[in-house]
């Protein structure tokens, strides 16, 4: 549990349980709907169902965390531990890809995502590097990741005409 001194909110994370899949799916859909409406990209998490969340819980390629604020589920964080990412052919030992972090829309912009990311990182004791990508025109995402210690790699990937992904990383020493 981490207390945000500014707002005095109790924030915690833990490994996601299967019975949380539906609630997390609903939060994910609500959080990613505006991005789907803007970009209309087929990879948007808004398009994924409850089975997608449940399947990732049972895979050694992923680690899923549930975010709690004052005991209530407010979001999720998904890390990829093995395999391909948009910017890396194959994750190496100690590299982790922050595939998505999402928060209930009414709880966004309260540093919950940033704090949850920092809490999740403690769950990877062998981590050398964390990677994340996001649409480069989303300034609130950029600020969130920068405040969590990520830096811009300068790499970009044109996913479709109106969607360019920016790659950020956090190297641990």
Regions found by a protein language model. Name each.
Residues 114-115, 137-154, 160:
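Conserved active-site alpha-helix within GNAT-family acetyltransferase domains
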Residues 12-26:
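A short beta-loop-alpha structural element at the N-terminal edge
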Residues 1-5, 162-173:
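Terminal substrate-recognition subdomain of acyl/acetyltransferases
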Residues 29-54:
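Conserved GNAT-fold acetyl-CoA-binding loop/helix
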Residues 100-103, 109-122, 143-147:
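Conserved acetyl-CoA-binding loop-helix of GNAT-fold acetyltransferases
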Residues 66, 72-83, 87, 97, ...:
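Conserved beta-strand in the GNAT
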Residues 123-136:
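Conserved GNAT acetyl-CoA-binding A-motif
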Residues 88-105, 132-134:
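Conserved acetyl-CoA binding element of GNAT-fold acetyltransferases
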């Amino acid at each position: 549990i981490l207390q945000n001194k500014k707002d005095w909110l109790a924030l915690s994370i833990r490994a996601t349980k299967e019975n949380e899949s539906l609630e997390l799916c609903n939060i994910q859909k609500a959080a990613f709907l505006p991005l789907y409406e803007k970009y209309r990209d087929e990879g948007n998490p808004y398009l994924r169902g409850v089975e997608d969340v449940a399947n990732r819980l049972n895979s050694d390629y992923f680690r899923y965390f549930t975010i709690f604020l004052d005991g209530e589920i407010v979001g999720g964080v998904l890390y990829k531990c093995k395999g391909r990412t948009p910017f890396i052919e194959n994750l190496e030992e100690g590299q982790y890809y922050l595939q998505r972090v999402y928060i209930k829309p009414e709880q966004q912009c309260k540093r919950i995502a940033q704090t949850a990311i920092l809490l999740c990182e403690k769950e990877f004791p062998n981590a050398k590097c964390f990677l994340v990508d996001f649409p480069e025109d989303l300034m609130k995402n950029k600020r969130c990741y920068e405040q969590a210690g990520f830096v811009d790699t300068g790499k970009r990937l044109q996913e479709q005409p109106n969607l360019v992904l920016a790659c950020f990383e956090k190297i641990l020493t």
